[in-house]
Amino acid sequence: VYKRQVQEVAFGLANAISVLDAIEVAPEKMPAVFGRISFFCNSGIRFIGETCKMRAFTRMWDQLGRERYSVEEAKLRRFRYGVQVNSLGLTESQPENNVPRIVLEALGVTLSKDARTRSLPLPAWNEALGLPRPWDQQWSLRIQQILANETDLLENGDIFEGSKVMAAL
């Protein structure tokens, strides 16, 4: 059911491994190199799948750093990534319905504290119709500010820890 999410993790990690394995660097410098690798991910409307994807990405990257590349410092093993929400899913016929789509896609990559994105550009609600106007772009910024500053989303630990649904996936 979450084939796209599994593929995104697999391709992302495989690409990073191929780059890291090809780099000719002294073993003592590998942790610093590993710590500079970053990813750009997509977030779609499948909220549970997207949340699980980022949690898996984060944990697998940490494990890869420890076990394959002997990176001891946790800070250097941190999964560094930015996310673009899936603007391909925005509709032209009823653009006002894109608002909840964008918010759900943003929540999928921000709610899980250990897998929270550090960068989240959001599309404009009417982007399916054409280039956004300045007000439309400002609206996207306001969504980010509301999520970050007017809610308690960033004040809590991983609210999905212990979830049977998350553990099963």
Which ranges hold each PLM region?
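Short, small-residue-biased leader/transition segments that mark boundaries at the very start
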Residues: 1-2
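Generic beta-strand/beta-sheet core signal
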Residues: 40-42, 82-86, 102, 120-125, ...
